[in-house]
Amino acid sequence: MTPREAEKIILADGWQLQEIQGSHHQYTHPTKPGEVTIPFHTKPKDLNRRTLNSILKQAGLK
């Protein structure tokens, strides 16, 4: 899964882009605690499986 595909999943769940620091996009949710960080420096390649799992856990989707 590419960073853009992961971003689509996060945005569909209601997360909103908070800020961009270099190649890392950070998202916050109006009701869920914490932040989700997606690294975009890997594009157009797929995200590492462990990185993807971490993103989904941060978002409360896994």
Task: State the predicted function of each range.
Residues G14-E19:
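Short secondary-structure junctions
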Residues R4-K8, D13, T28-K62:
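C-terminal structural segments of small proteins and small subunits
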